[in-house]
Amino acid sequence: MRLSFKVMLIVVLSSVFASAQTQAPAAAAQHFDKGGLAFDYANGWSLKDMSNDDAQEFGLSNNAADVQMRVFVHKGKVTADKLPDAKKAFIDPYVAAVEKQFVQMGATPQKSADTSEIGGVKADGVLLSASLGGDPGAAKFYWAIVGQRVVVMTLFGPDRDIKKFAPAWDLLRNTIKVEEPKPAASPSPKPSP
């Protein structure tokens, strides 16, 4: 009788844990849609618009995280054969500037190639790993052409927070959509009486 009670208790507890895991609500998301760029981002994250005439640029931060996410979308149309030129013009200098900043902070960054996806499109990338004050971290850069525009996404932070907040990064990265901006609605002429 004692053995069957233990078995029954294990089955019940396993069922409760499995039920709790499968019924956990998905994190609610906020939606951004402006100028042909749309994406979702997790609740609790603040969105800062740093856009200019050349690009839409947004920074995302969370008071509970030592992580920053950035989205940069160049406003000009780019074809696949022109992506190397765009990389040379503004992606490589951006990566180099962050690498230099790590060195100025006393770190010895290790640079390696990486890949990911942005909005379902294969993205090339660079991973800069470094330890600041004994705390390992990284800056991850990814770029791809999405909707005929160059999209660059960056994730900065200590490894522990990058791992902890990976679902927020994945939500942002996977929901990026770029379309032609919809023209402003113009009033239709009214017939004269």
Question: Where would I find each of the regions flagged by the language model?
Answer:
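N-terminal secretory signal peptides that target proteins for export/translocation
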Residues: 1-3
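Bacterial N-terminal signal peptides
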Residues: 6-16
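Disordered, low-complexity segments in secreted/periplasmic proteins that are enriched in proline
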Residues: 20-24, 190-193
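N-terminal "mature-domain start" segment
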Residues: 23-55
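Soluble non-cytosolic domains of exported or imported proteins
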Residues: 36, 84-93, 159-170
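Solvent-exposed, polar/charged alpha-helical surfaces in well-ordered, non-transmembrane soluble domains
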Residues: 39, 43, 92, 96, ...
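Surface-exposed amphipathic alpha-helical segments
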Residues: 45, 149-193
